[in-house]
Amino acid sequence: MQCGAACLAMIVNSYGVKCSLEYVSQMLHIGKNGVSMLAITEAANEIGFNCQGQLYTVEQLKEAQMPCILHWNQNHFVVLFKISKKEVFCIADPGKGLLKLTFEDFCRHWISTEQQGTRGTVLLLTPTEKLENFHIDKYHSNKSKHVLWKYILKYRYLYIMLLLGLFVGSLLQLVLPFLTQSIVDVGIKNQNIGFVWLILLGQLMLTISRTAIDFIRRWLLLHISLRINISLVSDFFIKLLKLPMSFFDTKLMGDLMQRMNDHSRVNTFLTQQTLNITFVIFTFVVFSLVLFFYNKLVFVIFLLGSILYGVWMTLFLKRRKVLDYELFEQQAINNNKTYEFITSMQEIKLQGCEQRRRWEWEDTQADLFGVQMKSLKLQQTQEAGSIFINEVKNIIITVVAATAVIHGQMTLGMMLAVQYIIGQLNSPVEQLMNFFYSLQDVKISLERINEIHQMDDENGKEGLQTSIEDKSEGIDIKNIMFKYDPHALRKTIDDVGIHIPQGKVTAIVGASGSGKTTLIRLMLGYYPVLEGKINIGNTDINKLNKKWWRRQCGVVMQDGVIFSESIARNIAVDDGDIDKERLLKAAEIACIKDYVMALPLKFNTKIGRDGVGLSQGQKQRILIARAVYKNPDYIFLDEATNSLDANNERSIVENLDKFYKGKTVVIVAHRLSTVKNADQIVVIDHGNVVEVGNHESLTAKRGAYYNLVKNQLELGN
């Protein structure tokens, strides 16, 4: 989904301007359906390019300015950097890396099926002077580099204890090759069984000491690991709760779950690999010095072999990074598909689409398997080379050491000690390379986590106010314009101006998709308007602390959520101690009290996914009770009674009419019975206000409102 952002970032960086993928992604406002070429064009213009979208033949493309962005396979974007004289096309694919394609392969991916197989879509980008002055320092903080230190320093004393344990353990391990040499060169050579037993007893004591140290180290490691993991995930959740709703509109559930898994990777790196690498480096340095002391030639052979091993392993780093990103995206899609498959079981069975939905899931598994196969091939190639280099190095060292023993340059005990040291050094070299791999993986994970932490909170710098000036002025909506995708042509809300009087009931009606729910979301501060202004009293909504503002509101949305908790906790969601009197009153107004009191556990009955199942009408009544329990000054109801039967709806509407006294109420509804008693009715059509009045005046006018309600019972004839 980020292929468009990656392509634009690559082109910007190719001109020597540093630009992160996160920054470009924010400029593009990438949604769940990806990004359009129009969005890429507008973002590129802002950065400093003149853009031109064209339908070109391959011959025209050869004359075009490069790098340029190509529409690939009708659903993807890539960058074309160069076309050689032999017609080899150099492509940068965000999902696959650098590719060199033949003329036939290139045409198969690029040529549009809608252009009779002759042309493809290309976005040409010409740099301007604006690009040279483009700075994004704000988005190039070193936070992702030093964020780990916050957690390490927090538990620095425990880390110091662990490091001491590691150093003591490695020092004890250092004694072992000398003991091995002593057994062979002194005990066995002199046939001194007492000396052999003494050395073996020493080895036993060393083993017991190392085991005890390792036992304590593991407990400390578990303690630190749990604490850091909780801190990491908790900080992530705190940040998520501060983000605007627009963020959640653009992210798949699977994407967020994958970022949660990234925290486990970071936690493992912090608590295990950072400590182990300290131990590994210490072991490597000390044993290398001992090996140098025993035989300089063996040391040189080992060093050259290790360098060759390291060079071989680093050749795969860049490709592994590309595959990691590809695997991340595919796992996110897979998680999302699996979650949807399980939670939609009822609808799947009702519609009889079991086979098709299963095939869709299997297609996702096939795509995931394809990426995993590419990772496995890369890993096998890497391992085959590393094993070959290591084995050749070990064989050469064995030959050199054996030759030295034969020529009297080394004793047999020294040779055994050298073999032990080589065995101990091979592991640190491998662990060092694994550490660099883990470091690369953690950098990728930190980039993804940091992308969230660097996003602006929904309150921004202005939204700190926790009071409303001149509340009696009601809510004033002044010529606002809004669209969910800033790059879209169609406006969801267009030049809407409404005054919602304080202490009165205002109903918003209109056909489905006309913008009613969006208007409520804007009044709740879900999204900033693109033009115009919303005032609560005389206070700009952008200056209000959004969390504080929503606490002043009782809200029932169409997609309200029932938590897996007791009925009482579902109604009093934000209260530390539940006010039983308010709880009963709220349940009574919502006409849910009789149902609850008939249950064995009454208000302590658990509902939601893990509890008692509820009908849609019962869910709506609990959501209404939740809004009433807050006893707010502002109430927003979005189709709050559309799942209720006529009798229950009539009773609840009558109860709410009494509850509304002195409160500012905004209702979105289709049913006439819900809106006809409103003090003011606003009719919206395609994002525009077309009528304002009360039920009597609008009915008499026989305009848009009349056409909406005329088929309902009271106006049927």
Label each residue range with its predicted role.
Residues 1-53, 60-66, 72-74:
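Cysteine-nucleophile protease catalytic domains, especially the papain-like/related folds used
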Residues 199-210, 214, 276-325, 397-410, ...:
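Transmembrane helices of ABC transporter permease
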Residues 28-35, 41, 62-73, 77-165, ...:
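Noncatalytic regulatory segments and standalone regulatory/sensor domains
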Residues 468-717:
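ABC-type nucleotide-binding domain
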